[in-house]
Design a protein with these regions (language model features):
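Non-catalytic terminal/interface segments that mediate subunit docking, oligomerization
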Residues: 18, 23, 29-32, 37, ...
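Alpha/beta enzyme core
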Residues: 6-8, 18-42, 59-65, 83-215, ...
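Active-site beta-loop-alpha junctions enriched in small/polar residues
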Residues: 14, 49-51, 78-82, 107-111, ...
Length: 530
């Protein structure tokens, strides 16, 4: 039975970092290598050793540290078809050779526009180039390298088809194991019919299979995304062509519009390959649950990721619409094509203007509070009204603050107080437990207005003990605001802290006491019992 494993060739450290603004430090290259090993890529292209001393050092260090590990990927280095670059790349990869974990990836421009622009007069000496392909690849193969040959600009080769055929022959004859067929400029499209590069791959694969029977050659695709077709072209290379390796970058980073997104290809193969052949489908050996981790690393350290980016984008598994969230709360796959846990993510439900009562209730109950079927719509509307200017949605913590505001038994619209030598009086306007309107209380003694407020609270709620009271100004000057913290204990000994702020220190303390009592009341009456 044919082995239909599709190798994943990760060029994030090479092609990905060639994108302006995407470069990482030496240490970050090593950190990324560890993540690539955890996710299980088959080949990691660590860089272009001839580009600079630092690039050489990065590739060489990765080859030393990871080439010896049993579960590490093959470590690849890229070079042009130039002997000095071949030698430098071999030297950089030598630490991984004895573990059979070293790949030299060499390319030659063959596109009708690319070839003369890149090679100059050398482009006219096609026979000389074919000889160089053979000689330099043989040199690398004899040094113990696995060799990959890329005819750069393959999808735009046009009239160079026969020349490209000869270079592939020379590469295979010299010992190349992988023939990679790049859509270098991202201009390939299946509408090209007979000029489509996947059809050319099939022709070349047939020629090599006929001329080198029994030779194990892996065909590979390397697609750029300039027309947004990189994923389709890469998958076509596998599903409709001879490709058994996909080259690309996680998050689709890379030159210009980027390389193909590896995570998209991996998940498409996982979910759709069986539609072609359910008995022996194409597959990868990627640990998909680690995909989110490596994707997040790239988004943090290379280039930001679009929120709506497929598979790993921040919004790819988040929902807000009321109808959607209602369905997802019953069945996560109602509005998801796959379980986000497959790639190491969780479904997120963001409460926003279009969210409904079921959504609010699910968050409230998950946070340990009571929300009944009868009141869920009213609770949701209260929270929406409270955050009416937050059209992009609110966090779960903000939603809970809205819920607590809905439950609060004391809501004071206006505080007023007065003091004499022997009394303090407080006047409140608003909601005070079951009473709405004006509340007045006089306290005999030299205590502050806070004592009068506590006297009212003890009547309606039950006695509370003020255990601590701290007030301080947030700034200096006459416009400073007093910030108060008050800790209370109820009859059962439960402790709650409230906070308040006002330019009037007495009112800031009263606000803090109200906040603490509200918390105590809600915990006592609306906290779910285990």
């Amino acid at each position: 039975m044919e082995n239909k494993k599709v190798r994943i060739f990760d060029t994030t450290l090479r092609d990905g970092q060639q994108c302006p603004g995407a470069g990482m430090s030496f240490e970050q290259n090593l950190e990324y290598t560890q993540l690539a090993m955890e996710v299980g890529v088959d080949v990691l292209e660590a860089g272009f050793p001839s580009a600079s001393h630092l690039d050489f050092e990065i590739v060489n260090t990765i080859a030393k540290l990871y080439g010896c590990k049993e579960n590490s990927p093959i470590i690849a280095g890229l070079c042009q078809l130039r002997e000095e670059q071949i030698d430098t790349t071999i030297e950089a990869l030598l630490p991984a050779v004895k573990f059979k974990k070293a790949m030299l990836h060499v390319y030659l421009p063959v596109g009708i526009h690319l070839m003369p622009a890149s090679l100059g007069e050398r482009a006219d000496d096609k026979q000389g180039l074919i000889k160089d392909v053979y000689n330099f690849i043989k040199k690398a193969a004899d040094a113990g390298m696995e060799v990959e040959y890329s005819p750069e600009g393959y999808s735009q080769m046009g009239e160079n088809f026969d020349f490209v055929t000869d270079t592939i022959r020379a590469a295979v004859e010299a010992g190349a194991y992988v023939i990679n067929c790049p859509d270098t400029t991202g201009g390939a499209c299946s509408f090209q019919k007979n000029n489509y590069f996947v059809d050319d791959m099939k022709k070349h694969a047939a020629i090599i299979a006929k001329e080198y029977p029994g030779r194990d050659v892996i065909w590979s695709v390397h697609c750029h995304n300039d027309f947004g077709l990189a994923t389709q072209n890469s998958i076509n290379g596998v599903f409709q062509g001879p490709a058994r390796q996909i080259e690309g970058c996680f998050n689709g980073v890379g030159e210009r519009a980027g390389n193909v997104s590896l995570e998209q290809c991996i998940m498409i193969i996982k979910h759709f390959a069986k539609e072609l052949d359910d008995k022996n489908p194409f597959y990868t050996t990627i640990n998909t649950e680690k995909i989110a981790k490596i994707s997040d690393y790239i988004a943090k350290n290379m280039l930001p990721r679009q929120p709506h980016f497929p598979i790993t984008g921040y919004n790819a598994t988040r929902h807000s619409s009321g109808g959607h969230t209602n369905a997802i709360l019953r069945n996560p796959l109602a509005y998801q094509p796959f379980d986000p846990k497959e790639v190491g993510k969780e479904i997120g439900i963001v409460f926003g203007p279009l969210s409904g009562g079921n959504h609010a209730r699910s968050i409230i109950e998950r946070c340990g509070y009571v929300c009944t079927e009868e009141e869920k719509a009213e609770v949701a509307q209260h929270i929406k009204d409270l955050y009416s200017q937050r059209r992009k949605g609110i966090t779960d913590d903000e939603l809970i603050r809205g819920y607590l505001d809905y439950r609060a038994p004391i809501k004071i619209e206006a505080f007023d107080y007065s003091k004499t030598a022997q009394t303090s009086e407080v006047k409140l306007k608003g909601k005070f437990f079951t009473f709405k309107g004006d509340v007045r209380e006089v306290h005999e003694g030299k205590d502050s207005a806070l004592a009068a407020l506590k006297k009212i609270i003890d009547k309606y709620f039950g006695p509370v003990e003020v255990q601590s009271h701290r007030s301080k100004s947030d700034t200096s000057g006459i416009t400073a605001v007093s910030v108060s913290k008050i800790t209370i204990a109820d009859e059962l000994g439960a402790v709650y802290e409230g906070s308040g702020a006002d330019q009037d220190i007495e009112i800031s303390a009263m606000k803090a006491l109200v906040d603490a009592v509200n918390k105590a009341y809600i915990e006592r009456n609306y906290r779910k019992k285990n």
